[in-house]
């Protein structure tokens, strides 16, 4: 059975209750996930002979099976639908493509000297979290100025505990140097508290207090102290001016504006926290051309907040479909009232107008870039004799220093440009690879990548299968990759491979391109497609080097406690919290160590012996 017949057969067993339904295609892939207040009534709509959009008609014709989950309420169905859409990525659903976590600023409190840092992920560390910020750039600009204003450390605990003299940041007046006791614990904690107050929106009060202290220091002829306070006041004023403080006191809100053109949409998001605009981000959700702005915005909002806490106020440029249901679902997740509004006048309307303008401008840029990108991909098709313009290009490179901390990197590009959410890092695990063996590293990367891709393909997910694979290297890298793919049962017909080798003088513009069974060739130095391929290769190189540096930094930052058997993350955290640093642990006696939760006498003796064996 297929299409409408499959749907009619499933209707026989459906209850008239809330729930979620899934439609599957020929290969078992999920075509669509939908929710309904009444499953039977909703699904029966698909059996009508006419009145469907092209998208829905095509989806019905491709349907080969269906599955259903009954829920207690329509609100629960909406939340489940959003979660399934994000995880399954069905072809016919609106999909939030760039669904990465947003960064926060963390003032970490589980140390004698609180650290300020950029933070992503689940909130596991003890401390004060401020955000979300729209992007890493907004966080880093704020952190940079906060360092000038509050002199908080940014170094990791392992670096802090190893300091014997102030670092460069203290010399340029960015850190109070608590590591070597140049500031008392009480004064440093006060600085951390002031930074937290600033990020909570109390900057005005803080500026007044510091100004009063500066005047008092000046009158007392303590000019160095007055100068330091003056610099801090200036830094705070700079942050406030660049963060677009809201004059009418919108304390906490997210602002969403949607722009559409030619079947493409852009959703612009502003984050307002503590009365400040903490940045903007533009999103380009995947959807069919016939879908409307209210429909797209509804799906976007529920997916956006699937793993994020919503603020009290959400402003939208136009009401999404089922706005009341979305409001109810978000309130259920947050455990408090959430207001979803489309203001018509006042400051909130002005804020939305600004977001709408940003959305339109971002969409115009995106469409211009897409047109240029399509032309370049058509040129790539011609250069490499492809059947059609590639929609997914994967580019690979390795990075290491004499074989240490070796990492492989994969970047992905397509009609929409670089797909950074699809980038991957491969830590080289094979201990039999000779240090520095680039061919061996590439073999491992390709084996892992395509073994997984083949499993996904069998399961019906072909969206991640590359149309073109580019490798940074010459004929040797190409042959190593071909051998690895052959071991997996893949041929050049299954995976289109090209390796890029720089010329003998390694100058850009003299690259040679190698393909299986064909003579190498060069492209004209001024060809736009050559510049594009160079950009792809350079982006893969940048990504691989960045991954290598991260791995090397993590290795360097390892605590001495990591080397002691019996100390995992929980005990390590307890020891550092109790003694302040690894150096403090190293100086502790057995009896002192036993005072820490989770440390018995045997472990205390082992820890003491580790640091005092010499």
UniProtKB/Swiss-Prot annotation:
Top-level taxon of the source organism: Bacteria
Domain UVR: 204-239
InterPro entries per record: GIY-YIG_endonuc, GIY-YIG_endonuc_sf, GIY-YIG_UvrC_Cho, Hlx-hairpin-Hlx_DNA-bd_motif, RuvA_2-like, UVR_dom, UVR_dom_sf, UvrABC_protein_C
Domain GIY-YIG: 16-94
Molecular functions (GO terms): DNA binding; excinuclease ABC activity
Entry keywords, A to Z: Cytoplasm, DNA damage, DNA excision, DNA repair, Excision nuclease, SOS response
One term under GO cellular component: excinuclease repair complex
Pfam families: GIY-YIG (PF01541), HHH_5 (PF14520), UVR (PF02151), UvrC_RNaseH (PF22920), UvrC_RNaseH_dom (PF08459)
GO BP term, example: SOS response
Keyword Protein transport listed: no
Localization, UniProt: Cytoplasm
HAMAP family: UvrC (MF_00203)
Assembly behavior: Interacts with UvrB in an incision complex.
Protein family membership: Belongs to the UvrC family.
Known role: The UvrABC repair system catalyzes the recognition and processing of DNA lesions. UvrC both incises the 5' and 3' sides of the lesion. The N-terminal half is responsible for the 3' incision and the C-terminal half is responsible for the 5' incision.
Descriptive protein name: UvrABC system protein C
Gene for this chain: uvrC
């Amino acid at each position: 059975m297929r299409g409408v017949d499959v749907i009619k057969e499933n209707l026989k067993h459906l209850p008239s209750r809330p729930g979620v339904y899934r439609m599957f295609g020929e290969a078992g892939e999920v075509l669509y996930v939908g929710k309904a207040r009444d499953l039977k009534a909703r699904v029966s709509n698909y059996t009508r002979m006419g009145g469907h959009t092209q998208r829905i008609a095509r989806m019905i014709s491709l349907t080969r099976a269906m599955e259903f989950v009954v829920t207690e309420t329509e609100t629960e169905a909406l939340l489940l639908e959003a979660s399934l859409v994000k995880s399954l990525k069905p072809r016919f659903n609106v999909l939030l493509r760039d669904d990465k976590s947003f960064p926060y600023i963390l003032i970490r409190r589980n140390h004698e000297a609180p650290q300020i840092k950029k933070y992503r992920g689940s909130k596991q560390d003890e401390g004060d979290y401020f955000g979300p910020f729209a992007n890493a750039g907004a966080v880093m600009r704020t952190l940079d100025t906060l360092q000038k204003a509050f002199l908080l450390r940014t170094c990791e605990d392992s670096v802090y505990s190893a300091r014997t003299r102030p670092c460069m940041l203290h010399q340029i007046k960015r850190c109070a140097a608590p590591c070597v006791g140049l500031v008392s614990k009480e004064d440093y904690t006060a600085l951390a508290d002031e930074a937290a107050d600033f990020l909570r929106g109390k900057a005005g009060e803080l500026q007044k207090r510091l100004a009063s202290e500066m005047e008092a220091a000046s009158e007392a002829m303590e000019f160095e102290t007055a100068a330091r306070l003056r610099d801090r006041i200036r830094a705070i004023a700079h942050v406030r001016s660049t963060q677009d403080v809201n004059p009418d006191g919108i304390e906490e809100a997210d602002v969403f504006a949607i722009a559409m053109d030619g079947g493409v949409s852009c959703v612009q998001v502003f984050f307002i926290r503590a009365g400040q605009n903490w940045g903007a981000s533009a999103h380009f959700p995947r959807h069919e051309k016939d879908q409307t702005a209210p429909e797209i915005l509804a799906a976007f909002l529920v997916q956006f907040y699937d793993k994020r806490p919503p603020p009290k106020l959400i402003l939208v440029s136009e009401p999404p479909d089922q706005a009341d249901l979305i409001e109810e679902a978000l309130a259920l997740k947050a455990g408090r009232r959430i207001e979803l509004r489309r203001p018509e006048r006042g400051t909130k309307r002005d804020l939305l107008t600004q977001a709408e303008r940003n959305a339109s401008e971002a969409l115009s840029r995106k469409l211009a870039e897409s047109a240029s990108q399509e032309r370049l991909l058509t040129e790539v098709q011609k250069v490499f004799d492809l059947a059609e313009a590639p929609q997914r290009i994967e580019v690979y490179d390795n990075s290491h220093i004499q074989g240490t901390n070796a990492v492989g990197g994969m970047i992905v590009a397509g009609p929409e440009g670089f797909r950074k959410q699809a980038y991957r890092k491969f830590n080289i695990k094979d201990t039999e690879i000779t240090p520095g063996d680039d061919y061996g590293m590439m073999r491992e990367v390709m084996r892992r990548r395509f073994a997984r891709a083949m499993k996904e393909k069998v399961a019906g997910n072909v969206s991640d299968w590359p149309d073109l694979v580019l490798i940074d290297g010459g004929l040797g890298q190409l042959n190593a990759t071909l051998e690895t793919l052959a071991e997996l049962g893949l041929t050049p017909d299954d995976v289109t491979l090209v390796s890029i080798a720089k010329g003998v003088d390694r100058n850009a513009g003299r690259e040679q391109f190698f393909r299986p069974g064909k003579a190498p060739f060069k492209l004209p130095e001024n060809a736009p497609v050559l510049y594009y391929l160079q950009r792809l290769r350079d982006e893969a190189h940048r990504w691989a080097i960045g991954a290598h540096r991260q791995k090397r930094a993590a290795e360097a930052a390892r605590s001495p406690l990591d080397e002691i058997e019996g100390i995992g993350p929980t005990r390590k955290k307890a020891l550092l919290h109790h003694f302040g640093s690894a150096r403090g642990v190293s100086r502790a006696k057995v009896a002192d160590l036993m005072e820490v939760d989770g440390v018995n006498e045997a472990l205390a003796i082992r820890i003491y012996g580790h640091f005092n064996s010499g």
